[in-house]
Design a protein with these regions (language model features):
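An N-terminally biased module of ancient metal coordination in phosphate/nucleic-acid-related enzymes
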Residues: 1-93, 99, 178-196
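Amphipathic alpha-helical segments that form well-ordered structural scaffolds
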Residues: 60-63, 98, 150, 154-157
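Amphipathic repeat-derived elements
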Residues: 2, 62-104, 109-145
């Protein structure tokens, strides 16, 4: 079904209302729309929902979904981060207890957190260009290949983890790690190690 399912209303770092997303999807001629604000995580993160905001989001989105029932498909989901057990030991238990315990129509499963920053906190690969440069230099000792290989190794783990979620999933931004590689600043994407 031709639709848009990776959308962030203003409950996390996104903007706009669920109703505005529905109207925009209809205007674009899409057959359906899904909303998928960033799910809460068990540590401080500026761009995910808090638990309280998550409950508000689901309730508000269900109201909009009900309003459109029978006339336009609206799916209520989240963008759910893969939280590697070595990085966030309580991540899976937190998600089961607080996010996956809520009835959702689907999830966009994504990888943002790769390793720790210099202060020991989970580090998001897409935080900023400056953060990425610092992570490459400080945490990876200038070895961007190692960071990229860590990212794709974790993507393999994400694929296995997602199969057990018991809701439909869409994999989000498979190649997020190259977001800051504009002009091949860090590596050549044609290199054999990257292509493999």
């Amino acid at each position: 079904m031709r639709g848009s399912y990776h959308n962030h209303p203003g409950y996390c770092d996104g903007s706009g209302t669920v109703e505005e997303f529905v109207a925009a999807a209809q205007a674009a001629g899409l057959a359906a729309v899904g909303v998928s604000s960033h799910a809460p995580v068990p540590f401080t993160c500026s761009w995910t929902m808090t638990l309280e905001r998550f409950r508000e989001y689901v309730a508000d989105a269900r109201v909009v979904q009900e309003r459109w029932r029978g006339s336009y498909p609206v799916w209520v989901g989240v963008e759910l981060d893969y939280l590697d057990a070595e990085l966030v030991p309580d991540g899976a238990a937190f998600q089961r207890a607080h996010v996956l315990s809520v009835q959702l129509d689907y999830a966009v499963v994504s990888l943002h957190f790769v390793g720790r920053d210099s202060e020991g906190q989970p580090w998001a690969v897409d935080e900023s260009a400056e953060s990425f440069a610092q992570q490459v230099d400080v945490v990876y000792g200038g070895n961007v290949r190692r960071l990229v290989e860590d990212y794709y190794r974790l993507m393999e783990h994400l694929a296995a983890w997602a199969q057990g979620l018991r809701i439909p999933v869409v994999v989000g931004h498979l190649d997020k790690v190259k977001q800051w590689n504009v002009g091949e600043r860090y590596f050549r994407e044609a290199e054999s190690w990257y292509q493999e």
